[in-house]
Amino acid sequence: MDERDMVKRVKVFASSELKLNILLCLKYREMDVNDLQGVLGGRNTTILHAIRDMTDDYLISRGRQGYRLTNLGKIRGCVLESLMGVLDDLEARPDFWLNHDISSIPPEMLERLSMLRRSEMVSTNPASPLEIHERLESLLSTSKKISAILPLLIFPKDSKVFTNALRRGSRVDLLMTEKIAGSLLDDGSISAYEVERLLKFESFRLRLIGEDLKLALFVTESFLYLGLYRHDGVYDVGTGAIYLGESAVAWGMELFEYYAQRSRELDEGDLTRVFRSSIQPEAEAPPLAGEDPGAFDVMIVEDDLGHATLIRRIFEESSPRWRVHHASQLQDALRWIEESYGRPFLVVADYLLPDGCGLDLAGKAERPLEVGFPLIILTGFGSEKIAAQAFKSGAMDYVVKEADSIQRLPEIAEEALLRWRELKRRAAGGEGHPSPQEGQGLPLKV
């Protein structure tokens, strides 16, 4: 039978809603015509006619207590239920599957998406783009077994998610890409020695894979978390799916094992060698349009470590030219600005900080050039009053902490730098107010 004939047969069978319902009703127990009528409604004669057709197709046979499925009927019922499960999941969250890159999910795993029927979808709150990761971290804090695939740093580098799990006796099987393994050492926040300490736990396994994976996966004894990259190549930090139940966990473990078999396990002896080779500098990327060659310093002034990590990652993933720094307090930022005098930089500062306001960095300035550097203000809530205050204090831009706006920060920074250079050009040509030296503005009011 060729494919066209098979399509015709499937179409004939699928076109009968009654036959499909009979197949599902008989999947778990024998039923007579009256039982089927009680569940499905309709006339006995109509049900009997459908049963006759299904008997001729060897899908149904007579049993002691009524009608039952043959082996062919049971197989077709399982296929039907699987198809319904896939359609149910796709219809429940079409945006999740439509707007993300699923190339790292093998075709055989996509065929078994019906295993994810029992699920809960957690989407970001626009005012809290890290809500999904906070929820994930909370669930992991009580998990006894964690198998994870990390193509990027989901949590802050100083997060204790895995360390705490090992200390309470949980098993942790961690699979990382070579790229993320190298980034663990890039700023000294974690060292090979510290990872070696984790490897001393018998319940900890560390694997490395050279493929560029486009998914993040966490599987525990009770749930599965799946995070995907958008089609533009950026990981979607604001949206993920949490699936509950044994079937979903089984699907997640199959996906984990698929990549675990393609990875290599590390021990204490080869850990340092692997990390050193993974962080060899890559070829310098060409400068962005309108930019001078070389790196550009960006200071993130943010007391929320999770938000700061997210913003750092967005900048670093957008271009290797961004050299990102972080300060959690105003005084630390002021000290860095003073030390950076004489070289160009940009500051992205939260409006509310533990020891002041992000606008305090502008001092007594009323115009951008009087600030002495491009300043972008972040806030967790939109306010026309704050926006007006920001611009009156010389800020180049004002950004509300919403998922889309945070993702666009590198683009917003580029636009701010272009406007900043244009302001300096005009000032140098006598078209505007005099320009202070780069990094030197009016006295700060802290």
Curated annotation (Swiss-Prot):
Induction behaviour: Autoregulated.
Gene of this entry: filR1
Matches recorded under SMART domains: REC
Job of this protein: Member of the two-component regulatory system FilI/FilRs, which is involved in the regulation of methanogenesis. Regulates its own expression, expression of the filI-filR2 operon, and of genes involved in methanogenesis such as acs1, acs4 and mtrABC. Acts by binding to the promoters.
PROSITE patterns: RESPONSE_REGULATORY
InterPro entries the record matches: CheY-like_superfamily, FilR1_middle_dom, Sig_transdc_resp-reg_receiver, WalR-like, WH_DNA-bd_sf
Protein name: Methanogenesis regulatory protein FilR1
GO biological process, alphabetically ordered: regulation of DNA-templated transcription
Organism: Methanothrix harundinacea (strain 6Ac)
Source superkingdom: Archaea
Keyword Iron-sulfur in record: no
Domain Response regulatory: 297-416
Keyword annotations of the record: DNA-binding, Phosphoprotein, Transcription, Transcription regulation, Two-component regulatory system
Keyword Phosphoprotein on entry: yes
